[in-house]
Amino acid sequence: MSDTLLAFDFGTKSIGVAIGQRITGTARPLPAIKAQDGTPDWTLIERLLKEWQPDEIIVGLPLNMDGTEQPLTARARKFANRIHGRFGVTVTLHDERLSTVEARSGLFERGGYRALNKGKVDSASAVIILESYFEQGY
């Protein structure tokens, strides 16, 4: 069973990032990565992988509330496949429904409107995705 996991909240302009430990079931945000129409700076992804050496990558899978796919779903899958193809690391897709809503709510409670900048919301969403993955017993 892997110990260190890196999570991504895929977006077309910003990709949230979180690091977590399976043994504690906790995660913390890392700085978000800017993207150009969903394409990240792959050298930044490579640096993250070298620095944290995760055993597994979790990518949030955006779904509609009824579980059906939306336009962003295919792009998140493509992002996950590219990470696996480029770096050979295990990548798992995980349902991310309501993670952004929960992230915004938590950030607002702690810091009001000033805390709601895009990068912070995206990385807070990545934390929620990873903690949800841990809670489901993975």
UniProtKB/Swiss-Prot annotation:
Query: Which GO molecular function annotations are given, in alphabetical order?
Result: nuclease activity
**GO BP, one annotated term:** rRNA 5'-end processing
Q: From which domain of life does this come?
A: Bacteria
What are the UniProt keywords, alphabetically?
Cytoplasm, Hydrolase, Nuclease, Ribosome biogenesis
Keyword Nuclease on entry: yes
Among the Pfam families in the record, one is RuvX
Primary location group? cytoplasm
Question: Localized where?
Answer: Cytoplasm
What is the consequence of disrupting this locus? Essential, it cannot be disrupted; cell division is arrested and cells form unseparated doublets with well-defined septa.
- What EC number is given for this enzyme? 3.1.-.-
Which major enzyme category is it?
A: hydrolase
Q: Name one GO cellular component term.
A: cytosol
Signal peptide as annotated in the record: none
Q: Does the keyword Cytoplasm apply?
A: yes
- Give the PANTHER family listed for this entry: POLYNUCLEOTIDYL TRANSFERASE, RIBONUCLEASE H-LIKE SUPERFAMILY PROTEIN
Homology family: Belongs to the YqgF nuclease family.
What function does this protein fulfil?
A: Could be a nuclease involved in processing of the 5'-end of pre-16S rRNA.
Q: What is this protein called?
A: Putative pre-16S rRNA nuclease
- Biological source species: Salmonella typhi
Query: Taxonomic lineage per UniProt?
Result: Bacteria, Pseudomonadati, Pseudomonadota, Gammaproteobacteria, Enterobacterales
Q: Which gene carries the instructions for this protein? A: yqgF
